[in-house]
Amino acid sequence: TDDPSQDSIENDAEEDSPGPKLSVRFSKIETLKAKDFSDCSSVELRELHQLIGNLKFSSSKRASLRKRDTKRNPKKLNVSKSIRKAFETDGEPIYLKYSRKDTRPRRLVLLLDVSGSMEPYARALIRLAHAAVVGRADVEAFTLGTRLTRITRELTSRDPDAALRSAADSVRDWSGGTRLGATLAEFNNEWGIRGYARGALLVMLSDGWDRGSPDVLRTQMERLQRVTHRLIWVNPLKHTPGYAPLAQGMAAALPYTDEFIEGHSFDSLERLTEIISS
């Protein structure tokens, strides 16, 4: 005969099965990842900030002037080393030497707009900058508002909360006005053109609102484009239905960007890391 207690055990097992609960949890996380930061509660933002902290920034490579000995690519004959080696065998080129160009990580420069219009997104973007600074070499981070502030050193702490507090304390124009052209000019003159920007992958994170002259911003973007390897503009407003880059700052800057992408959600920032690493 059938044991009625067996049905009870099976029903209990089905109720206790983690499958449906995990599925619901996974669905909620995926929904949260696609949610606009400006629509998130404080609890949701905390969870998203943790996810942002786990994003990986692989280093794209650039060719170095240095060469490395190799046995794998016989097409790259190192003539000078082969001749020197031949002197050890009475001038006979018995041992040929090969080399290839060495590679180095390409510098990543992050410029973050912390003006009032970027308030709903700024903290998530600072979290992103922290993940980049602690996750790979050759990363520089600056904030832009009414002034330029370098925050690379403040973001080097492995503790994300401590790093963000330190960065926030050093940024005096947080949630203030916007002078993108003027602050970009300061970056170009003091840090960028002869240093950090040259050959770098530069990421501008801004909604493009600027109270200054669009001609100034246009000039500074043109200068940046000439020296950077690649210039990416991340705009949190780009995902908005019907959006067009009509703000005078964004319209002035757009012709000098290599890629123009969204930056309003975790999913969009994850896509940015993929572009950076490619």
Label for each model-derived stretch:
Residues 102-170, 180-186, 201-204, 237:
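Von Willebrand factor
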Residues 121, 141, 152-153, 193-199, ...:
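Extended hydrophobic-aromatic, low-complexity segments
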Residues 174-208, 213-218:
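C-terminal structural cap/anchor segments
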Residues 221-278:
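Von Willebrand factor type A / integrin I
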